[in-house]
Structure formats: C-alpha cells, structure tokens
C-alpha cells in the first residue's frame, strides 16, 4: 500500500496533488488546508492513514527546499486565523507577481505597498493610491482602470479592502516580508511580542512599541489590567479576543443551519 511504504522526503501523488491545488489558490486558511489534504488522500490513497498536517507539509517542504520554495504558515493580522501560502524564497520582491500582472499594474501595487508601509495605521485610502496613477511606469492607466486593478489585487489575495481603504493580505506579508524589511528600513514596523513584520496593530501611546492584534489578544489574555510590556504604562486599547477555531466552526455551522432553514421556509 502506497501510504504505508512512503518515506520521509518522498512525495506521493497525494502530496503532488495537494501542492498543485495550493499553488492554484495561492493562500488558504488552515481549515481549508486540512480539507484539501483529506480530499487528496480520498482521491489518491483512501486506505492510508492521514498524516498530521505539520508532518505532511514538512515532508513536502523537504522536497521543495532545493527549489527555494516553501509552504509557509502565518496568521491574519486582524484576528489571528492561521493561513498557509506557497512562498518563493528566491524571489521575494513584487516581481514575484509578474506572471499575473502587467508592468503598470505591478507599479500600482508598489505605490500601494509604499503607502501602506509608510502609514501609521497600515492602511492606504483608495483616493491616495489613485492619485499616484500618473506616476506609473509603462502603459498609461486611467483611474477607472486602476480601481479595477486594485480589485484584482483583492481577488488574488494580495490586498484586503475595508471601507475604501487597502492593507496587505496575509499572503503578501508571508511572501514579501523580507523584501519589505529591506526596501523600507526606515518605515518598517515590528511586533514587540513575536518580532515579525507588523502592518496593522496597536501601539503604546507612551513608548511607541507596537503589537499585532493577535499578539495583543494572547499577551493580555489573563491580565485584568493591561500594561505595556516595555514601559509598563497602562495599555489604553480594547483587547481583542484570542482566535478560537472551535467557536468559529460553531458559528459557521449555526449560520449554515439558519441558511438551510430559510431555504426550506421559502
């Protein structure tokens, strides 16, 4: 049986299909990755014991290592949901996106990226991004076209849009962290807890240190009176909840149940 004889560092059809589908999606949440893994076993090796996800991905990564590619795990900056993306370790710049976008579209992304990294909030307004359209390299782009390109970035999970403002998707942070650190050394912000790149989060009003929202949630989880971990001054911000996959799953089941109930009622 294929599942019982495979060795570490060897890819089976299960691994290959998983990798191919992950490449198609670009980035997936952890629950989607687990579902994808199970699907691949069902298609290619249904009698095998499903590997632990961490072992399964480590096995693929050991093969991809020589190609400077890696399946990397991260979390969303707003609520700490685990995500996985296929990251090109050799090409960390915006040029990684070149196969999907034209030169002027990539330049628009660079402009948006710079505004986002430079901002205090980690967001750039669509107005500010569109005002830079005249400075783009390559073919001229109208503002209407630029709006459509920004939506392409959202659909491709490079950007997130919230109420007319844009920030980086977790995919962009996973793939471009090193590039961003090197390209914007004077603007880049780091989390005081995990020491990772920080685009959006909370900051201490006294000493200025910053923390990701999920890091804030975990750090202050059992502390009734939150104080800055650096200067010990009072932390004035609302403390978000720690991400709970079980709670989200229950909410999703409840939501789908209500939806099916409404369907039956009509």
From Swiss-Prot:
<dbReference type="Pfam" id="PF07574">
    <property type="entry name" value="SMC_Nse1"/>
</dbReference>
<keyword id="KW-0862">Zinc</keyword>
<dbReference type="InterPro" id="IPR014857">
    <property type="entry name" value="Nse1_RING_C4HC3-type"/>
</dbReference>
<feature type="region of interest" description="Disordered">
    <location>
        <begin position="246"/>
        <end position="266"/>
    </location>
</feature>
<keyword id="KW-0863">Zinc-finger</keyword>
<feature type="compositionally biased region" description="Basic residues">
    <location>
        <begin position="256"/>
        <end position="266"/>
    </location>
</feature>
<dbReference type="GO" id="GO:0000781">
    <property type="term" value="C:chromosome, telomeric region"/>
</dbReference>
<keyword id="KW-0833">Ubl conjugation pathway</keyword>
<dbReference type="GO" id="GO:0006310">
    <property type="term" value="P:DNA recombination"/>
</dbReference>
<dbReference type="GO" id="GO:0046983">
    <property type="term" value="F:protein dimerization activity"/>
</dbReference>
<keyword id="KW-0832">Ubl conjugation</keyword>
<dbReference type="GO" id="GO:0061630">
    <property type="term" value="F:ubiquitin protein ligase activity"/>
</dbReference>
<dbReference type="GO" id="GO:0008270">
    <property type="term" value="F:zinc ion binding"/>
</dbReference>
<keyword id="KW-0233">DNA recombination</keyword>
<dbReference type="GO" id="GO:0005634">
    <property type="term" value="C:nucleus"/>
</dbReference>
<dbReference type="InterPro" id="IPR011513">
    <property type="entry name" value="Nse1"/>
</dbReference>
<comment type="function">
    <text>RING-type zinc finger-containing E3 ubiquitin ligase that assembles with melanoma antigen protein (MAGE) to catalyze the direct transfer of ubiquitin from E2 ubiquitin-conjugating enzyme to a specific substrate. Within MAGE-RING ubiquitin ligase complex, MAGE stimulates and specifies ubiquitin ligase activity likely through recruitment and/or stabilization of the E2 ubiquitin-conjugating enzyme at the E3:substrate complex. Involved in maintenance of genome integrity, DNA damage response and DNA repair.</text>
</comment>
<feature type="zinc finger region" description="RING-type; atypical">
    <location>
        <begin position="191"/>
        <end position="232"/>
    </location>
</feature>
<keyword id="KW-0479">Metal-binding</keyword>
<dbReference type="GO" id="GO:0006974">
    <property type="term" value="P:DNA damage response"/>
</dbReference>
<dbReference type="GO" id="GO:0097431">
    <property type="term" value="C:mitotic spindle pole"/>
</dbReference>
<dbReference type="GO" id="GO:0005654">
    <property type="term" value="C:nucleoplasm"/>
</dbReference>
<dbReference type="GO" id="GO:0000775">
    <property type="term" value="C:chromosome, centromeric region"/>
</dbReference>
<protein>
    <recommendedName>
        <fullName>Non-structural maintenance of chromosomes element 1 homolog</fullName>
        <ecNumber>2.3.2.27</ecNumber>
    </recommendedName>
</protein>
<dbReference type="Pfam" id="PF08746">
    <property type="entry name" value="zf-RING-like"/>
</dbReference>
<dbReference type="InterPro" id="IPR046349">
    <property type="entry name" value="C1-like_sf"/>
</dbReference>
<keyword id="KW-0808">Transferase</keyword>
<keyword id="KW-0539">Nucleus</keyword>
<dbReference type="InterPro" id="IPR002219">
    <property type="entry name" value="PE/DAG-bd"/>
</dbReference>
<dbReference type="GO" id="GO:0006281">
    <property type="term" value="P:DNA repair"/>
</dbReference>
<feature type="region of interest" description="Interaction with NSMCE3">
    <location>
        <begin position="1"/>
        <end position="102"/>
    </location>
</feature>
<dbReference type="InterPro" id="IPR013083">
    <property type="entry name" value="Znf_RING/FYVE/PHD"/>
</dbReference>
<keyword id="KW-0227">DNA damage</keyword>
<dbReference type="InterPro" id="IPR036388">
    <property type="entry name" value="WH-like_DNA-bd_sf"/>
</dbReference>
<dbReference type="GO" id="GO:0030915">
    <property type="term" value="C:Smc5-Smc6 complex"/>
</dbReference>
<keyword id="KW-0234">DNA repair</keyword>
<keyword id="KW-0779">Telomere</keyword>
<comment type="similarity">
    <text>Belongs to the NSE1 family.</text>
</comment>
<keyword id="KW-0158">Chromosome</keyword>
<comment type="subunit">
    <text>Component of the SMC5-SMC6 complex which consists at least of SMC5, SMC6, NSMCE2, NSMCE1, NSMCE4A or EID3 and NSMCE3. NSMCE1, NSMCE4A or EID3 and NSMCE3 probably form a subcomplex that bridges the head domains of the SMC5-SMC6 heterodimer. Interacts with NSMCE3.</text>
</comment>
């Amino acid at each position: 049986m294929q599942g019982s004889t495979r060795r570490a560092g060897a890819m089976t059809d299960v691994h290959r299909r998983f990798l191919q589908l992950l490449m198609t999606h670009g980035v997936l949440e952890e629950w989607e990755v687990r579902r994808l893994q199970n699907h691949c076993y069902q298609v290619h090796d249904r009698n095998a014991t499903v590997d632990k996800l961490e072992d399964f991905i480590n096995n693929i990564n050991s093969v991809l290592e020589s190609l400077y590619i890696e399946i990397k795990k991260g979390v969303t900056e707003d609520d700490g949901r685990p995500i996985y993306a296929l990251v090109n370790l050799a090409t960390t710049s915006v040029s990684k996106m070149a196969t999907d976008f034209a030169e002027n579209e990539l330049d628009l992304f660079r402009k948006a990226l710079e505004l986002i990294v430079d901002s205090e909030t980690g967001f750039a307004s669509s107005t500010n991004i569109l005002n830079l359209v005249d400075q783009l390299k390559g073919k001229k782009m109208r503002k209407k076209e630029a709006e459509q390109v920004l939506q392409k970035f959202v659909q491709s999970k490079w950007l997130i849009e919230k109420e007319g403002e844009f920030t980086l998707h977790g995919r962009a942070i996973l793939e471009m962290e090193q590039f961003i650190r090197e390209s914007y050394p004077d603007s880049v912000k780091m989390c005081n807890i995990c020491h990772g790149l920080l685009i959006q989060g909370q900051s201490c009003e006294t000493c200025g240190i910053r923390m990701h929202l999920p890091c804030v949630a975990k750090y202050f989880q059992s502390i009734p009176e939150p104080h800055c971990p650096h200067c010990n001054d009072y932390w004035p911000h609302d403390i978000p909840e720690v991400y709970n996959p079980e709670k989200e799953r229950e909410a999703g089941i409840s939501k789908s149940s209500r939806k099916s109930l409404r369907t039956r009622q009509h």
